[in-house]
Amino acid sequence: MLKILIPTLMLFPTIWFSPAKWLWTTSIAQSLVIALASLSWLKWSSETGWSSSNLYLATDPLSTPLLVLTCWLLPLMVLASQNHISPEPLNRQRTYISLLVSLQMFLILAFGATEIIMFYIMFEATLLPTLIIITRWGNQTERLNAGTYFLFYTLAGSLPLLVALLLLQNDSGTLSMFTLQYTQPMHLLTWGNKLWWAACLLAFLVKMPVYGVHLWLPKAHVEAPIAGSMILAAVLLKLGGYGMMRMMVMLDPLTKELAYPFIVLALWGIIMTGSICLRQTDLKSLIAYSSVGHMGLVAGGILIQTPWGFTGAIILMIAHGLASSALFCLANTSYERTHSRTMLLARGMQMILPLMTTWWFVASLANLALPPLPNLMGELMIITSMFNWSHWTLLLTGLGTLITASYSLYLFLMTQRGPLPSHIIALEPTHTREHLLITLHLIPIILLILKPELMWGWCF
């Protein structure tokens, strides 16, 4: 664990003491080396699955893929931000990259924590850098409104969790993930325990987010700069799913009784957000709503508590993280050239930037879960396990898949095909930086299907 944490910490002096000319190059190079070093986590070899450097930080097959995804994303965020942050004053550029690095530190500590209270503290700590990135570097003035939504939704959702954790500490005397799975704190079906169950899961349902408490997400995504959108879509939403999986072990007998409304809400959300996507005019908003739909499927897979559901949820979280981050990067390349997020004002791009269209096509297909990609594997495992749980869910998940395919193709056709508007005839060509950025997103998706056991948790 420290072989990643210490180099990440050493990124701060790199950022603040590098000369202006080399700031971006050194930051990207060092963070890419850290990302490559983090791949060594995937080779875990212990009987329990846990491999711990000490009592407080450990990795297991559930957290490892998410840790590697976090490390992989930092160089990509810095790479994506270079164009629109580099004209700013030097100290502001340094502050921006430092915020991204601190976010990575908090996320590594959150996914690596073995004490639930430490996980909670890091879960909350990720709020601060994200909030600063949205409210300081967002594009429009609505960013303050978006930041407020983001802050209050997340805080209001996670305060009951803090109370629940303190009660649990008082009751069982420990909050360590190693021991809590052997103590069953909630074997009585009393009203107090039911409220406690809801408090434990509410924070994660808001963070995922499940349909109904999702209003902060489109606002935050639309107003955030590119790095904010990428980290939010790729890793911060996954904190919710990861937290739910960790807490599910303890909440056992109650979940079977109380999870029904949340499963229905999650599945209904897939159809509702898909329908909302079909009538979006704003590019980033469409991608943000599609994230809510995919996370609804993940929530359903986790709440039915079957090994296949858990496995499908982990795979879909990783695959969706890379695919939606790639889509946000592509939306940003379009926005930097046309200065508009409205799809009608930036269409027919295939005429001018044909190679970008190829990237758009691959990313859209990854989003709609085309066969060779892990997105399909995750979705199929969740849909199959839900079908075994109740046959009626097939109506909702099947319709959701159909709508997902529809809006993904609608997104591709609206941005890339059709007549070219007269005001965007002369656009600057694509840079190697942008091609590298999208390649580093899409290559892991394509390669992961060759060795999916890296990310399917304990079920092997």
Swiss-Prot record:
GO CC annotation terms, alphabetical: mitochondrial membrane
Any one GO MF annotation of this record: NADH dehydrogenase (ubiquinone) activity
Membrane topology classification: Multi-pass membrane protein
Main subcellular localisation: mitochondrion
Transmembrane segments: 20-42, 61-81, 94-113, 117-139, 148-168, 195-215, 225-245, 258-278, 285-304, 308-330, 351-371, 394-414, 436-456
Keyword list, A-Z: Electron transport, Membrane, Mitochondrion, NAD, Respiratory chain, Translocase, Transmembrane, Transmembrane helix, Transport, Ubiquinone
Matching Pfam families: Oxidored_q5_N, Proton_antipo_M
Catalysed reaction, written as an equation: a ubiquinone + NADH + 5 H(+)(in) = a ubiquinol + NAD(+) + 4 H(+)(out)
Keyword Chaperone included in the entry's annotation: no
Its EC number(s): 7.1.1.2
Any single biological process term in GO: ATP synthesis coupled electron transport
Cellular compartments annotated: Mitochondrion membrane
Domain of life: Eukaryota
Function field: Core subunit of the mitochondrial membrane respiratory chain NADH dehydrogenase (Complex I) that is believed to belong to the minimal assembly required for catalysis. Complex I functions in the transfer of electrons from NADH to the respiratory chain. The immediate electron acceptor for the enzyme is believed to be ubiquinone.
NCBIfam families associated with the record: NDH_I_M
Record family assignment: Belongs to the complex I subunit 4 family.
Protein name: NADH-ubiquinone oxidoreductase chain 4
Organism from which the protein derives: Salmo salar
